[in-house]
Amino acid sequence: MFLVRDIMYCKPGNARPMVQKFQALSKLLQQMGMGSMRVMTDVSAERYWTVVAETDVKSLEEFTEMSRTASARKEFQDVMKGYHDLIDQGRREIYMLET
């Protein structure tokens, strides 16, 4: 099992719109049978206006296929349209779950 964590450092005032995009994306992934995401905002973090989305996957191959399948769908493209305007930068972390 792996945990995939997408960390977005939003521009001031844009954390809520990014949360809404991740929430809509989570619903879309659930409809596609791909599980749900945990969406979090910072209380205290490295930077203000941080939004984190986490997904558990069985394998990196599953994650790669899930990403390809979702990103090819118009619904996904509509949900994520304009998200670059909301963020300064972002990064992805992938962890192997040991327990």
Language-model features: where?
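Absolute protein N-terminus
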Residues: M1-F2, T99
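Active-site-flanking beta-strand signature of metal-NTP-handling nucleotidyl enzymes
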Residues: L3-M8
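Short, surface-exposed ligand-recognition loops at beta-strand->loop->(often short) alpha-helix junctions
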Residues: Y9-Q20
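Short coil/turn motifs at secondary-structure junctions
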Residues: K11-G13, K58-L60, L97
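An amphipathic, aromatic/His-enriched active-site/gating alpha helix that lines ligand/cofactor pockets
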Residues: Q20-R38, E54-E93
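Short, solvent-exposed loop/turn elements at beta->coil junctions and helix N-caps
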Residues: V39-V43
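Short proline/glycine- and acidic-rich turn/helix-capping motifs at secondary-structure junctions
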Residues: S44, H84-D88, T99
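Short acidic/glycine-enriched loop/turn segments that link adjacent beta-strands
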Residues: A45-W49
